[in-house]
């Protein structure tokens, strides 16, 4: 999924500018999915002759804003931005529009109104609803369909990367919907924010299972 998404992002860049320098802002490097994504992106773009610089936002939106401004000052021909915070989309879009830099937003989808604010802006992401459905189907494919204790329902802990993120919302909704559509009774025991952090997710699970 990461490789195909990276290829789509690269295609969006080539549609906007032929050659030149591309600045890539990743919300944080310490994320397995985004590591695969950025490595694939760099390989694809450099293979097409682009000069690529990728920076780590360290999960800090203020730092990422500075990185975007630095890239603009350096005169990049295009930007690829994986926002730290979904709520920062307005500011990011205003900045790149003011600089007239073609920009690809990845992995955290803005609203339709935000996307329409700048004609050189595109979004590339996975089908989050489909991803959520696949997650639910994985549970349905287990021997007991997720009903481990045999009480006739699937009791679950839901860990969301970021509740403000549209993709996270859709994955949450459709993973559960896949179960209920199959006639499975469900019970949510806990809903926590995990910030796409494996250690935090493990800690939440350990606390809930204690």
What name fits each language-model region?
Residues 1-210:
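A residue-level marker of the well-folded mature domains of exported/periplasmic proteins
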């Amino acid at each position: 999924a990461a490789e195909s998404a990276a290829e789509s992002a690269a295609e969006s860049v080539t549609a906007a500018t032929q050659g030149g320098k591309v600045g890539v802002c990743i919300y944080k490097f310490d994320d397995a999915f985004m590591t695969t994504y950025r490595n694939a992106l760099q390989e694809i773009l450099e293979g097409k002759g682009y000069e690529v610089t990728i920076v780590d936002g360290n999960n800090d939106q203020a730092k990422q804003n500075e990185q975007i401004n630095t890239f603009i000052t350096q005169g990049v021909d295009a930007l690829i931005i994986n926002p730290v915070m979904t709520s920062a989309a307005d500011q990011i879009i205003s900045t790149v529009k003011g600089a007239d830099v073609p920009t690809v937003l990845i992995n955290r989808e803005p609203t339709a109104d935000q996307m329409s604010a700048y004609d050189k802006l595109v979004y590339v992401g996975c089908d989050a609803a489909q991803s959520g459905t696949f997650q639910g189907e994985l549970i349905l494919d287990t021997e007991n369909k997720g009903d481990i204790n045999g009480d006739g329902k699937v009791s679950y802990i839901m860990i969301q990367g970021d509740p403000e993120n549209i993709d996270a919302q859709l994955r949450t909704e459709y993973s559960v919907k896949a179960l209920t559509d199959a006639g499975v009774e469900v019970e949510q025991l806990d809903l926590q924010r995990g910030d796409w952090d494996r250690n935090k997710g493990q800690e939440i699970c350990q606390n809930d299972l204690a």
